[in-house]
Amino acid sequence: MTDSSNAHEAENPTVPTPDNEIQDLQQEIATLKAELKEKNDKYLMVLAESENARKRMQKERQEMMQYAVENALIDFLVPIESMEKALGFASQMSDEVKNWALGFNMILQQFKQVFEEKGIVEYSSVGQKFNPFLHEAVETEETTKVPEGTIVEEFSKGYKIGDRPIRVAKVKVSKAPAPQGTEAEIENNNE
């Protein structure tokens, strides 16, 4: 029987030995560790993507709220400017009108305070170099008193939040005077 069992073992070499079992188990452990690492990496990637999406959505929501507030406040700019102009004339009126103007001026200051709290500030343009990002030129004026492209008059104020204008200022811009000479000389030069 020993001869036959030896012959049987020789025919069937897949009988596990303790060393083979250990090797197989170590291989299986290594494979499982690699799979676990891969799944953990995928989990961390999905978690990071989810966190980024959450932050992006939160930022978009905040921007939408900010734009909604801006748009609502922008609608008040024209009436506020009208009130400022009217209050400018109050100093020429009777004492009773001046007293009323003081009250309206307080209300105007409250509006301006709300604007500042929301980050909306007006900017002055007179004396500044024309910037198409901040200004809309509605008129030009020939002059040698200031360099060409300088704003000489402001028709309506500009407003911005941070560096972003929400309403550009409407201005008059200086330009260099036309060359001196008679019309006939200018026409002859053009021909």
Swiss-Prot record:
Disordered: annotated span: 1-22, 172-191
Highest rank taxon of the organism: Bacteria
Keyword Nucleus in record: no
Regions of compositional bias (Basic and acidic residues) in chain numbering: 1-11
Pfam families: GrpE
MF (Gene Ontology): adenyl-nucleotide exchange factor activity; protein homodimerization activity; protein-folding chaperone binding; unfolded protein binding
Cellular compartments per GO CC: cytoplasm
Subcellular location: Cytoplasm
UniProtKB keywords: Chaperone, Cytoplasm, Stress response
Example of a GO biological process term: protein folding
Chaperone among keywords: yes
Primary localization: cytoplasm
Function: Participates actively in the response to hyperosmotic and heat shock by preventing the aggregation of stress-denatured proteins, in association with DnaK and GrpE. It is the nucleotide exchange factor for DnaK and may function as a thermosensor. Unfolded proteins bind initially to DnaJ; upon interaction with the DnaJ-bound protein, DnaK hydrolyzes its bound ATP, resulting in the formation of a stable complex. GrpE releases ADP from DnaK; ATP binding to DnaK triggers the release of the substrate protein, thus completing the reaction cycle.
Similarity comment: family membership: Belongs to the GrpE family.
Quaternary structure (record): Homodimer.
Protein name: Protein GrpE
Phylogenetic lineage: Bacteria, Pseudomonadati, Chlamydiota, Chlamydiia, Chlamydiales
Gene for this chain: grpE
